[in-house]
Amino acid sequence: MLFRSGKSCIAKLYATFSWLEKALVRGDFSVAYLTKYNRFAKTFCSYQSIQSYFKDDTFLHYVGSAFEFVYENKRFQVKPCIGAVYERPQISYIPAERNLLSVIEDAENIKRLPQPLASMLGVYTSACRNMKSDLELPINQVRFHYDSLNKRSYIQSSDYKVKLNEASSGMQSLSPMFVVLDYLFKVVTKAVPVQQSDKSLKEKEMIQKRIAEILKDDSLDPEARRLLLEQTADSSNKYLLSIVEEPEENLFPTSQREILNSLLAYTSVGNNKLLLTTHSPYILNYLALAIKAWNVSKKVDDEELRKRLYAIVPAGAQINGEDVSVYQIDGRGVIMALPSYDGMPSDDNYLNNMLAECNDLFNDLLDVEERCEE
């Protein structure tokens, strides 16, 4: 989890590195192609619109499972990771602008959408068209309904039904995010079939081409060649990597809790991973609640106590603090890991401190008021 100014840029870099690693393993392009002409900054980072943030002294270092990337002095270097096992992820980037997909009808016909949003739109459209029944949303006991005949989305409950573009701003932010993540979760876990397409045939051709390149590369030792061949040949996505900007967007605190619980439930299955960015102290504190619930669950052996525990944090949303990292960014852009206690993030953090500062300022106002009455 990341919070404070600059967090989105870091999330976008992480998404870019993760996709590049996957693309190299899959054989979309060669290392030589990637490292020439400053393509990393000018081409691949422009996808996330962060190319203008680069400076002459920009230094980036990413260590993945299959490759290690270093950007320094405007040069991009790629090194294979020997001995590591690479599992191919289904990468889903959920941008903060996602509510546009709810507000604008026929969004697929709009030109010049930001590329991450356009990619999300493609998955969102596929999810809607493959929807066999209404999707239960995690807040307010409502469902997402897609009318395939008229190509319109609705929010409905037991006593009302409204078009998504007329629903609350919270619903407009929540719905596309939840529809996309639920669909991709089911694709990865094989709950819904993956549609075969011309793209999948092209992908097979790229894999065969990549295998041929590996076999011809005399610079690789036998072990490196074996690992790269295994990674390239396994073309299925093994887990869901969800990168979500501001899941709390336009939502009341109690709804933020339900959203976080749902996101954590997706993460609790298999090797799924989740990266969140947030401005919300509620998200951070509800995360601490989920970690504490996991700790308490190891001590509970009474059925009534277990029911009380699950009423606070559902079993699927409880998470081991050892699997969680929280980072805050200071005013200079320095990234700092938040200290933890029993796996829970420290409450001495920027978001909570801002709440405390607000209380202090209010107390100062009361003091001024009292002095006026003296």
Annotate each predicted stretch with a short phrase.
Residues 1-151, 229-230, 269-271, 284-285, ...:
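P-loop NTPase switch/coupling surface
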Residues 1-22, 159-371:
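Switch/communication elements of ASCE P-loop NTPase nucleotide-binding domains
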Residues 74-82, 154, 332-342:
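Short, well-ordered strand-loop elements centered on a beta-strand within folded domains, enriched
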Residues 87, 148, 157-160, 237:
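Short, solvent-exposed coil/turn segments
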